[in-house]
Amino acid sequence: TPSRSAEFFFGALVHQTIEDIHRWAMDGKADKLDESEIQNLFHLNFQNLLKRGLRPIGPKQREEAFVQVMNYFKQNRSEFSRIIETEVDVSVEKDNYILIGKVDLLLGGDGKLELLDFKSQPRPAEYDDRIFSYYRQLCTYAHILETRDGRLPERLMVYWTAEPKKEDALMIFPYERNVVDEAGAHFDKVVSQIQN
């Protein structure tokens, strides 16, 4: 549908531009980033999404997406030195399936590991079902990272880029093993239902 297509385009544009900012930071070029350079990255991502045949967003949505990117950049620039990795592929092999995901950002500092996922939408109300769903996803990714690398993330975070202020945008969760176990049981059940 057109609205879902626009929603995907918007989210991908914000997400890919923030990823580019992180890559610049990882390459030691964060100090060269300014609004003009970010506008160039944003424009390139817009063009690349068009080339993929996606239906573009209108000028108002495009401006809103750029504002989200710039708000994130301005309020989180001091964190860029803590970036360990961006767009981290994670997977775990189970008996009957392989669970695959992608972590948007790994941060570190003082020997601690933090996992962050971006959502290009407003922060939902506290008891919205999506929050637990995202939390379960983050716990699963944390478990995969612990299994793969032997390092357990201490903080799991969601960053709602549509929120203008960092304190509203950043949602922090603890890692809880029982949530991982519940998520694993949920995936096992879903796979079993699909196979049968």
Q: Could you say what each language-model-derived stretch is?
A:
Residues 1, 16-18, 48, 117-122, ...:
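Short acidic (Asp/Glu) and glycine-rich catalytic loops that position anionic groups and cofactors
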Residues 1-9:
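C-terminal, charged and often intrinsically disordered regions of DNA end-processing helicases
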Residues 8, 131-136, 177, 181:
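Short, conserved loop/turn and helix-capping segments at secondary-structure boundaries
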Residues 11-15, 65, 105, 141, ...:
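A residue-level signal for conserved active-site and pocket-lining positions in enzyme catalytic cores
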Residues 17-87, 93:
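A non-catalytic, helix-rich entry segment at domain boundaries
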Residues 18-26, 73, 120-123, 146-150, ...:
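Hydrophobic/aromatic-lined pockets within catalytic cores
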Residues 33, 143-196:
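Metal-dependent nuclease catalytic regions and adjoining charged, substrate-binding loops involved
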Residues 85-143:
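Non-catalytic protein-protein interaction segments used by genome-maintenance enzymes to assemble
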